[in-house]
A protein has these predicted regions:
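Short strand->helix junction
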Residues: 58-59, 91
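Surface-exposed alpha-helical segments enriched in charged/polar residues
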Residues: 11-15, 70-77
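Conserved acetyl-CoA-binding loop-helix of GNAT-fold acetyltransferases
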Residues: 60-74
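Terminal substrate-recognition subdomain of acyl/acetyltransferases
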Residues: 74-148
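Generic recognition of short, well-ordered alpha-helical segments
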Residues: 36, 67, 96-99
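A conserved beta-strand-loop-helix scaffold within acyl/acetyltransferase catalytic domains
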Residues: 1-58
Length: 148
């Protein structure tokens, strides 16, 4: 999404119960890719707003985008969110994912003159059938029952 934050800003988000920070690692047949994606999601009443979604281009199209999307949907359901929204800010490096929200079933709600676009997924409507083959491993810091 191209939004950049300082270390100080990230540290303040850690202590904010309206912000959810998640990271993802990928180990597959090609090897251990390590940390490959991070999310910053802001809770706004019954809306989850994907403020930042960064991902290493070396793992694109291996199903990780769909896996992370399914994690966002699980999170939204646990929090009883009615809407998931996201933004796309175009840059030289992220053209590969310019259609990601559309591919994941989000609807375009706003497009800015600078190319920024805003997307939403209504949790009350039938959700898109997105498949992936990624399996979650146990994580000591992930508790689906207690999202902040």
């Amino acid at each position: 999404t191209t939004t950049r934050y300082t270390e100080t800003q990230i540290r303040s988000m850690i202590n904010n119960n309206m912000t959810i920070l998640r990271y993802f690692r990928l180990k597959d047949n090609f090897g251990d890719n390590g940390l490959i994606s991070s999310l910053i999601i802001k809770r706004q009443a019954k809306i989850l707003f994907i403020d930042t979604w960064v991902m290493s281009c070396r793992v694109l199209s291996r199903g990780m985008e769909e896996f992370i999307f399914s994690e966002i949907i699980t999170m939204a359901k646990c929090l009883k969110s009615t809407m998931v929204r996201g933004k796309y800010l175009p840059s030289k490096k992220n053209k590969l994912v310019s259609s990601l929200y559309e591919r994941l079933g989000f609807k375009l709600i706003k497009k800015e003159p600078d190319g920024a676009s805003y997307w939403e997924l209504n949790m009350k409507e039938p959700l898109p059938k997105i498949s992936h083959t990624i399996k979650r491993t146990k994580s000591k810091d992930l508790d689906l029952e207690n999202w902040r």
